[in-house]
């Protein structure tokens, strides 16, 4: 099998770049379908529409309904056809951006991805995560190429909720853990190929950056400051993690995230990254990570306020039957658990999740605030 490396055609990051982006946008198209949720539109979208129109770009704004489902993608695709869009812009969080990619693919036009949060590694990838209308994981949708443009305005990121940045750090923390598992098993990446050395190296650098600058960046956002530490973490969350997971591969951490979508209740109020955080700890447990490495991740998660127990996941009374549903969905043949370097059964997932919950409670009782 060949090795493949993928990345967006152009990546732009910095303070105030959103309103200095006309030259990048007009290279791609002048009839823009802008997909954005209500919050993103209020924060930046309305002003951005005016900015584009001032630069001779015709814009059709379509409100995003909040779920990257087939029905939502088809709905907006029809609007794009009627408008005659030659460029789709996704503005907002991960699900809006994933939907924008799918809509552009349906329309066979270019796509520009403009995240208003550094909360996931979705922006740079050539795939979308699809869910049912009710929010249960459905499938991955793959494309022939990565986005034509990813543009990240760190001034906007600095004014977003701190929780969104920590969620992005959590998502990015899985990148190297999963990439190294794929490497050990000589598995396949999300590009359907073997890892390149570059993809693996980026995943490793991503983890190094997160541990080095993560807490500084969180403090910066808490004070709405676009610091150098924040710039580094935004790049790690968005570019390094996005390229690293795609060219490095996914394994148990994201499969367990997908498994958790089988549960009902307030767990659905958690972000993608918050669920991935628990998935990463579970993968480390499955691998038999030594105590020093496991504790490094656990301590960092606790510092950032990320979920490390069932109570944190809003499932304090979860039953073995419900955990088995998580295990079964996460080990489905179409998910990334198959890239682990050893066979993982649903029962193994249940045992590992219970082990993480128990160890975190023990660790906190004996180490936190002692």
Residues covered by each model-derived region:
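A short, small-residue-rich loop immediately preceding and capping a beta-strand
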Residues: 80-103, 107-117
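Active-site segments that bind and position negatively charged phosphate/pyrophosphate groups
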Residues: 190-303, 311
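ATP/NTP phosphate-donor binding region
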Residues: 1-87, 310
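Short glycine/serine/threonine-rich phosphate/pyrophosphate-binding segments
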Residues: 18, 41-45, 95-102, 120-124, ...
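A glycine/threonine-rich phosphate-anchoring loop and its flanking beta-alpha core
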Residues: 105-198
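C-terminal charged capping/lid subdomain of soluble metabolic enzymes
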Residues: 289-370
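Solvent-exposed alpha-helices and their adjacent loops that cap or buttress functional pockets
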Residues: 3-5, 25-27, 81-82, 104, ...
């Amino acid at each position: 099998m060949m090795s493949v490396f993928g990345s967006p055609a152009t990546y732009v990051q910095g303070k105030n770049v959103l309103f200095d982006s006309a030259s990048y946008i007009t290279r791609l198209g002048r009839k823009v379908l802008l997909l954005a949720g209500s919050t993103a539109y209020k924060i930046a979208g309305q002003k951005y529409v005016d900015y584009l129109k001032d630069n001779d770009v015709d814009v059709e704004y379509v409100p995003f309904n909040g779920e990257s489902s087939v029905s939502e993608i088809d709905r907006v695709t029809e609007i794009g056809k009627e408008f005659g869009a030659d460029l789709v812009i996704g503005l907002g969080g991960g699900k809006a951006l994933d939907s924008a990619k799918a809509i552009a693919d349906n329309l066979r036009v270019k796509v520009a991805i403009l995240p208003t949060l550094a909360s996931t590694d979705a922006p740079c990838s050539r795939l979308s995560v699809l869910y049912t209308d009710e929010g249960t994981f459905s499938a991955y949708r793959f494309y022939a190429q990565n986005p034509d443009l990813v543009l990240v305005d760190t001034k906007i990121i600095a004014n977003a909720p701190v929780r969104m940045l920590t969620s992005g750090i959590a998502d990015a923390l899985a990148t190297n853990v999963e990439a190294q598992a794929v490497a050990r098993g000589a598995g396949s990446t999300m590009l359907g190929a073997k890892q390149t050395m570059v993809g693996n190296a980026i995943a490793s650098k991503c983890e190094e950056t997160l541990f080095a600058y993560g807490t500084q960046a969180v403090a910066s956002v808490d004070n709405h400051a676009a610091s150098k530490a924040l710039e580094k973490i935004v790049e790690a969350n968005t570019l390094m993690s996005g390229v690293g997971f795609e060219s490095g591969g996914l394994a148990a951490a994201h499969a367990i995230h997908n498994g958790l979508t089988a549960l009902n209740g307030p767990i659905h109020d958690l972000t993608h990254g918050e669920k991935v955080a628990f998935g990463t700890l579970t993968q480390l447990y499955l691998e038999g990570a030594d105590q020093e490495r496991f504790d490094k991740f656990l301590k960092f998660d606790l510092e950032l306020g990320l979920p490390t127990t069932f109570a944190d996941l809003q499932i304090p009374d979860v039953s073995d039957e419900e955990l088995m549903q998580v295990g079964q969905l996460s080990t489905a043949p179409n998910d990334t658990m198959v890239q682990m370097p050893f066979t993982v059964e649903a029962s193994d997932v249940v045992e590992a999740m219970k082990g993480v919950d128990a160890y975190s409670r023990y660790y906190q009782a004996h180490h936190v605030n002692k």
